[in-house]
Amino acid sequence: MGIISTILGVIGFGFGTTIGIVIGYYLFIYFQSTDVEDPEIKPLVELDSETIATMFPEIPMWVKNPDFDRIDWLNKLIGHMWPYMDKAICKMAKSIAKPIIAEQIPNYKIDSVEFEMLTLGSLPPSFQGMKVYATDDKEIIMELSVKWAGNPNIIVVAKAFGLKATVQVIDLQVYATPRITLKPLVPSFPCFANIFVSLMDKPQVDFGLKLLGADVMAIPGLYRFVQEIIKDQVANMYLWPKTLNVQIMDPSKAMKKPVGLLSVKVIKAIKLKKKDLLGGSDPYVKLTLSGDKVPGKKTVVKHSNLNPEWNEEFDLVVKEPESQELQLIVYDWEQVGKHDKIGMNVIQLKDLTPEEPKLMTLELLKSMEPKEPVSEKSRGQLVVEVEYKPFKDDDIPENIDDPNAVEKAPEGTPSTGGLLVVIVHEAEDLEGKYHTNPSVRLLFRGEERKTKRVKKNREPRWDEDFQFPLDEPPINDKLHVEVISSSSRLIHPKETLGYVVINLGDVVSNRRINDKYHLIDSKNGRIQIELQWRNSS
């Protein structure tokens, strides 16, 4: 009887429990407490200040800040690409972490550390808004608001002394506002040399951590402690103005930084060809480096002389010694009309031995075309001395990667002086009365320089630089900048689109100024000029 009673008691308990669960389930579904109400949905403008303050952290940046733009298109793009980005990012993370782990584990007597599982989950990050800053420098600055409530699964297995331990990271949430700067902008794909990343605020990080299957973050006080440690460590490394620098390409090669100086001494010419009707010539020599935007340099004119002697020295900045060549052209000066070319020749810089002067006597040719027939009559000879002086490592600025860095003046500049560099970048909103084919004319201490002409353009870009070696700083000098439009028409062939006069005293004290100047005598025209003062020491 005792056994039968026990069996009946167990059956009754099981039956009663089952009936109770079923009845409770239906009561929970079909009956609702009277104090439970549906949430009330209101427009944001109707909410009181206290409610808005509570919701404020969740409001997107483009709502709180008018200068932030919505970038839903980017979120859609990343949403479609996320399954592939997840695999690519995890693969790259493993390849980066593997050698670092292999280098560190011997110090802790650990046999191995491996990823048993590494996935970022199915939920992509969300960009709440983006702000782009406009600057006059060659850079792009962006600020992003990033939120990521992901479902990653990262399992790391460590083995030591025959034991195995697993660490699992789950339910990762990150909120950060990074500033991304792309600079300097260069004319080679992807069109920027470096990526600089800074955090504008301390990031908010939340995650779950399991050790041997147990939730470590459930330990009282540990959760808050770990959060603060992570915030402080990340802030110490990347909180603005500190940056993470990722180099995409060598900026010195992309921007073709100067690597040396070519010293040329034009000594004399011998038995030049007669160009004038009276049996003479008025020769001068023009020197240029191939692939250089800087205008060529010229000797003085020697009137009525077929065997002129100049003994003039010139310094040319070299950027690509393996491919550049020095072009020497002898012209016959004419008071009216185009100057006649007497002859020319070139010197390949790769054929020169650095730091070794070389005296050369060049035969003047009609042109450097290989199919050009040899002239029956000699055009004369040109005697020059050339020396290539590569810059030493000490002469290269430490911050050469910085596009705003100012170099020193070339060797040979007077100790009390330096080099004034004027870079004409661009102009905007130019208005010509008859035509708009702008070029820029610079006038400094009686010396005139000009940029190339841009046809039919109200927003021209030149990016041409001009150098003025000076014996003393231009503290009290002024630079006259004039924008001119020229045309081949007989009527109104030239007109001024505006001008500006720049005091150079600030350039000497600041070493670099890059600004946009409003043009005088122009309604809305502006021109961007960059000025650099490079001391000789």
Swiss-Prot record:
Keyword Metal-binding among record annotations: yes
Q: What is its main location?
A: Golgi
Report residues binding Ca(2+): D276, D282, D332, E334
Record-linked SUPFAM superfamilies = C2 domain (Calcium/lipid-binding domain, CaLB)
Q: Which residues lie on this side of the membrane: Lumenal?
A: 24-537
| Record domain C2: where | 240-362, 402-517
**A single MF term (Gene Ontology):** lipid binding
- Cofactor list: Ca(2+)
Supply the alphabetized keyword list. Answer: Calcium, Golgi apparatus, Lipid transport, Lipid-binding, Membrane, Metal-binding, Repeat, Transmembrane, Transmembrane helix, Transport
Query: Topology: which residues are Cytoplasmic?
Result: 1-2
GO terms in the biological process aspect are: lipid transport; protein secretion
Return the InterPro entries for the record: C2_dom (IPR000008), C2_domain_sf (IPR035892), SMP_LBD (IPR031468), Synaptotagmin_plant (IPR045050), Synaptotagmin_SMP (IPR039010)
Tell me where in this chain the SMP-LTD domain is found.
Answer: 67-249
Membrane topology for this entry?
Single-pass membrane protein
Compartments reported by the entry: Golgi apparatus membrane
Is Transport a UniProt keyword of this protein? Answer: yes
GO cellular component terms? Golgi apparatus; Golgi membrane
* Entry's family note: Belongs to the synaptotagmin family.
Q: What does this protein do?
A: May play an important role in regulating an unconventional protein trafficking from the cytosol to the extracellular matrix.
What is the protein name given in its UniProt record?
Answer: Synaptotagmin-2
